[in-house]
Amino acid sequence: MVIDFHTHSFPDELADRAVGRLAQSGGIHNYLDGRVTSIQKSMKKAGIDYSILLPIATKPSQHTTINDIAVTTNDTFRESGLISFGTIHPDNEDYRDILRNLSKKGVPGIKLHPVFQRTNIDDPRYLNIISCAFDNDLI
């Protein structure tokens, strides 16, 4: 079994802009265009069984939309090997409810990104989020 454990996708209408911003802000060269269909084609070509999508909330207000997309992605594409994690921002004070909801909806884990979320991995907010994620059986 081959698993690509670090992929990103965006809704088709946002993909070009999001990929462009990542390239510009992080100096990241993308090999695909950020669309689920491109990841699926790449998986097939490379013999990848599963790809894990790791969305990132760069603002506290983004978690609802991003996590709704993650749940929809899992419901729609899990059978074809795409599994999306959820996300949370360290400034989300209601992190317990967010994590509990992700777990209830079958999302397997969360993506944290200290650089894009402008904090450090040992930030006490992250430590609280990680502990709560563990308590909710999230990776």
Region roles according to the model:
Residues 1-55, 60-61, 124:
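An N-terminally biased module of ancient metal coordination in phosphate/nucleic-acid-related enzymes
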Residues 49-50, 60-139:
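Active-site gating/metal-coordination segments in enzymes
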